[in-house]
Regions:
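Short Gly/Pro-enriched loop/turn and capping motifs at secondary-structure junctions
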Residues: 50-51, 83-84, 105-109
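Short, solvent-exposed coil/turn segments
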Residues: 3-5, 72, 85, 113
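Catalytic nucleophile loop of clan PA
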Residues: 81-104
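Structured core of small recognition/catalytic domains
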Residues: 71-75, 90
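C-terminal cap/linker of serine protease catalytic domains
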Residues: 14-29, 100, 104-155
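Serine endopeptidase catalytic core focused on the charge-relay Asp
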Residues: 1-69, 94-95
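Short beta-strand micro-motifs in enzyme catalytic cores
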Residues: 6-8, 74-77
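A structural micro-motif recognizing beta-strand termini
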Residues: 11-16, 78-84
């Protein structure tokens, strides 16, 4: 089970909650927890790795689910600009703005340039069952599934 359960939690000090915006840059959302995704479903994400040297036009991502692996714990996705080291933990949204997962792997083989996206619903269930209270916070910005707009907006 832990092979596909690469997950970290961030605890926000109550005094700092007003300073944090859970919206995904460029796309908005999440609008809530999304259900399981299927092969061919659209996905949206935003990565901000320092390896991109500040080039924010490479940060918004749109792609497709290629397959589901690990008994549903993860899905393999392809995006036009794949997630790279430093993007780990980036949220992935479905085409309605539902949060479906977090980027956990960059693949070299068997599907070079693909990313492993761990199933967020399962990760949250696992954390809660383990005694660690965890929940998704919805974004404050409306979800817009428009990668060109996300790029044009500079991320």
């Amino acid at each position: 089970m832990c092979d596909y359960n690469d997950f970290a939690l961030v605890k926000i000090d109550p005094a700092d909650v007003a300073k944090v915006n859970p919206s995904v840059p460029g796309f908005g959302g999440p609008v809530g927890l999304g259900g399981p995704s299927a092969t061919g479903d659209d996905v949206f994400s935003y990565g901000n790795s320092s390896l991109r040297l500040g080039i924010t036009y490479l940060s918004p991502k749109q792609g497709k689910v290629v397959t589901t692996v690990g008994g549903g714990w993860s899905r393999t996705v392809y995006t036009a600009t794949p997630g790279i080291p430093g993007d780990s933990g980036s949220g992935f949204l479905n085409d309605t703005g539902g949060a479906i997962g977090t980027l956990s792997t960059v693949a070299i083989a068997p599907l070079a340039g693909s990313n492993g996206v761990a199933a967020l619903g399962r990760e949250l269930d696992y954390a809660n069952a383990s005694g660690t209270p965890a929940a998704l916070e919805s974004g404050t910005e409306p979800f817009t599934p428009d990668v060109v707009g996300a790029i044009a907006g500079g991320g």
